[in-house]
Amino acid sequence: AQTAKDWAAKGRIRFDRLPADDTAAWQERMTGADLIWLESPTNPLLSIADLTTLCRAERKSGSILVVDNTFLTPLRQQPLDLGADITMQSTTKFIGGHSDLLGGSLATRDQHLVDRLRTSRTLLGASPGALEVFLTLRGARTLALRVDTAESNAKELAAHLGNHPDVSTVRYPGLGSMISFDA
């Protein structure tokens, strides 16, 4: 976000930061944007964007909707199926799983975007090395087990803390108590 803020300060782009769960504000801004970048759930507060509505919302012709899906991984959320143009993942986090990898991935079903992204990657040199690919594959092999375990543990912890007298708020979408929760 800092790079976007710097570019905006120089007048190179317009940058608006919106609460993920403010669907009306997103819909209003989407009609004039060239690039819409959503993170859902957000890190660290776990706010949930209404991706189904936003992916179907009216947008400027030719605009690109990107969803940062790092937190849920492709195992729990598939933004392309909801209508996003691009989904991105940080392979550094859940997918890698061992804190020894720096990387990311982009996915799209739009061949024109694939070609543009491939050209950018080639020109900028943003291609992973053999070790990074190995580490990503190693992490991907255990991803389902780790996500299932983390989800189970988080749900149990959130339920316990939600009933604790010294805890005023628990932000965990899986409990259904958040305003932005969608069962």
Residue ranges and their predicted role:
Residues 1-163, 171:
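Conserved PLP-enzyme active-site core in the AAT-like
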Residues 168-183:
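Conserved PLP-binding catalytic core of the aspartate aminotransferase-like
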